[in-house]
From Swiss-Prot:
<dbReference type="Pfam" id="PF05825">
    <property type="entry name" value="PSP94"/>
</dbReference>
<feature type="disulfide bond">
    <location>
        <begin position="38"/>
        <end position="62"/>
    </location>
</feature>
<feature type="disulfide bond">
    <location>
        <begin position="84"/>
        <end position="107"/>
    </location>
</feature>
<feature type="signal peptide">
    <location>
        <begin position="1"/>
        <end position="20"/>
    </location>
</feature>
<dbReference type="GO" id="GO:0005576">
    <property type="term" value="C:extracellular region"/>
</dbReference>
<keyword id="KW-0964">Secreted</keyword>
<feature type="disulfide bond">
    <location>
        <begin position="60"/>
        <end position="69"/>
    </location>
</feature>
<dbReference type="InterPro" id="IPR008735">
    <property type="entry name" value="PSP94"/>
</dbReference>
<comment type="similarity">
    <text>Belongs to the beta-microseminoprotein family.</text>
</comment>
<comment type="subunit">
    <text>Homodimer; Interacts with PI16.</text>
</comment>
<protein>
    <recommendedName>
        <fullName>Beta-microseminoprotein</fullName>
    </recommendedName>
</protein>
<keyword id="KW-1015">Disulfide bond</keyword>
<keyword id="KW-0732">Signal</keyword>
<feature type="disulfide bond">
    <location>
        <begin position="22"/>
        <end position="70"/>
    </location>
</feature>
<feature type="disulfide bond">
    <location>
        <begin position="57"/>
        <end position="93"/>
    </location>
</feature>
């Protein structure tokens, strides 16, 4: 059991370091444990099969064996970087791209990454 958990932690770390759009958090279980909830990284409890949005713009789901959190943020990369700048709107979990000289005017975007 410890070997499996250790392997999973290494895998989760690898996925996170690779700038993945999702991260995996093992749900700690002990023999005889019948807990029907997950504990997130802030210590909050969530029922199995529940979903929630985090403060850092991730959508998380609690499963029996793990919590999976995936980013909700699409990052614009295909725009005129000399003429425009991207601005992150945390309240909406999204970027907007506006002209540097006239921030009221948006710029066209042709590529996004998750």
């Amino acid at each position: 059991m410890n070997v499996l958990l250790g392997g999973f932690v290494i895998f989760a770390t690898f996925v996170t370091l690779c700038n993945a759009s999702c991260s995996f958090i093992p749900n700690e279980r002990f023999p005889g444990d019948s807990t029907r909830e997950c504990t997130d990284l802030k210590g909050n409890k969530h029922p199995i099969n529940s979903k929630w949005k985090t403060d850092n713009c991730e959508r998380c789901t609690c499963y029996k064996t793990e919590i999976i959190c995936c980013t909700l943020i699409a990052t614009p990369v295909g725009y005129d970087k000399k003429k425009c700048q991207r601005i992150f709107k945390k309240e909406d979990c999204k970027y907007i791209v506006v002209e540097k000289k006239n921030p009221k005017k948006t710029c066209p975007i042709d590529q996004w990454i998750l």
